[in-house]
């Protein structure tokens, strides 16, 4: 599971995801990518499940790049605990994903396999996505 090795602070505010992605909206490595169309917090488990689905469909050919990293801690209190008494412990790690953000990139496989793999991966995510292709010469 992805998570930071160390952080400046143990716990974070909930925060908001406003507007379009300020960076990471172009393909940097592969020929095909999976682009987010909605704002959402994506957990480390969802990222890993997506990576596995994509890799399995590609039959371990080609290369996969994960372009998001879960660096925000989400806290939760134990079950049946009364309100108050401080903030709960870190429960999971999430990545804040804004619309337009490239989540995954792949290369080294034919277009039909790439689109199928990314579609299977997209089914593991809680947001609407679309498959994008690199345009040469721009």
UniProtKB/Swiss-Prot annotation:
A single GO BP: translation
**InterPro entries noted in UniProt:** Ribosomal_uL16 (IPR047873), Ribosomal_uL16_bact-type (IPR000114), Ribosomal_uL16_CS (IPR020798), Ribosomal_uL16_dom (IPR016180), Ribosomal_uL16_sf (IPR036920)
Organism domain of life: Bacteria
A GO molecular function annotation here is: tRNA binding
Q: Which Pfam families match?
A: Ribosomal_L16
Q: Which family does it belong to?
A: Belongs to the universal ribosomal protein uL16 family.
Oligomer and partners: Part of the 50S ribosomal subunit.
Q: Could you tell me what this protein does?
A: Binds 23S rRNA and is also seen to make contacts with the A and possibly P site tRNAs.
Q: What is this protein called?
A: Large ribosomal subunit protein uL16
Tell me which species this is from. Hyphomonas neptunium (strain ATCC 15444)
Its gene? rplP
